[in-house]
């Protein structure tokens, strides 16, 4: 077995306690009954049991379950996507009511087959959730929508409470990790979002363990801050299958703590960093912290 395909043994700090209580099974049944998808399941998130069973939160994945891209870190299915489901926004909104969520994250597969990248359905989902859940904060996590400004404007005009778009990795590794996305296009996407709606916090995420250096990570932090990104999440990359990129390094919790301190010193209003941190992990706490910092700055 070559170094590139070898599975590294996971360290103790990555072992997860599984919890499949009534909250977990109830949420799973509800998602199936409403024909909805979650990135928690599709992307094999390691926190699914904590979020579903303990925190009773979930990240809805709209626009189908098949992505038009094939990023080498991601477990989501790729291929020819299904037709748009125009009733999906209302079903998501109804599910948020049923779950009693105070904060909801809405993400989507990349839909490069659509002229608007799925922006219209994304925006309508935000509006539907807002109509039926006026006190629920809404976080959106879109693809770069091919970098088309009109698509981003359509989404930002729906006034989500937070705009999240992930650069995923450092500049040096970006082409290898996500060939059909572009590092600078993602930075521009984040910058334009802030220009369109200055009061809406922006957020991005970086996976570590793909071969990046500390200098690479600091450069990425500087790039995000130069484009006015407010919140950063840092988490350990975990190889979904042998077909995906291998893990080069497992970062210990102490190193994540160091990276968090560096990020906060750069001016991020909030940084969530840890081995099991994912973009939507404790998202409700992140948006609350960012809004408090924004209010203090005024």
Swiss-Prot record:
Cofactor(s) recorded in Swiss-Prot or TrEMBL: [4Fe-4S] cluster
Cofactor, how bound (note): Binds 2 [4Fe-4S] clusters per subunit. One cluster is coordinated with 3 cysteines and an exchangeable S-adenosyl-L-methionine.
Binding site for [4Fe-4S] cluster 1: 40, 45, 51, 280
Gene3D superfamilies: Aldolase class I (3.20.20.70)
Binding-site residues, [4Fe-4S] cluster 2: 67, 71, 74
Localization per record: Cytoplasm
Catalytic activity: [[Fe-S] cluster scaffold protein carrying a second [4Fe-4S](2+) cluster] + N(6)-octanoyl-L-lysyl-[protein] + 2 oxidized [2Fe-2S]-[ferredoxin] + 2 S-adenosyl-L-methionine + 4 H(+) = [[Fe-S] cluster scaffold protein] + N(6)-[(R)-dihydrolipoyl]-L-lysyl-[protein] + 4 Fe(3+) + 2 hydrogen sulfide + 2 5'-deoxyadenosine + 2 L-methionine + 2 reduced [2Fe-2S]-[ferredoxin]
One Pfam family linked to the record: LIAS_N
Domain Radical SAM core: 53-269
Main location, first listed in the record: cytoplasm
MF-aspect GO terms: 4 iron, 4 sulfur cluster binding; lipoate synthase activity; metal ion binding
Major enzyme class: transferase
GO cellular component, as recorded: cytoplasm
Pathway: Protein modification; protein lipoylation via endogenous pathway; protein N(6)-(lipoyl)lysine from octanoyl-[acyl-carrier-protein]
EC number(s) from the headed UniProt entry: 2.8.1.8
Keywords annotated in UniProt: 4Fe-4S, Cytoplasm, Iron, Iron-sulfur, Metal-binding, S-adenosyl-L-methionine, Transferase
InterPro entries on file: Aldolase_TIM (IPR013785), Elp3/MiaA/NifB-like_rSAM (IPR006638), LIAS_N (IPR031691), Lipoyl_synth (IPR003698), rSAM (IPR007197)
Record-stated family: Belongs to the radical SAM superfamily. Lipoyl synthase family.
Designated name of the protein: Lipoyl synthase
Lineage, broadest ranks: Bacteria, Bacillati, Bacillota, Bacilli, Bacillales
Gene behind this protein: lipA
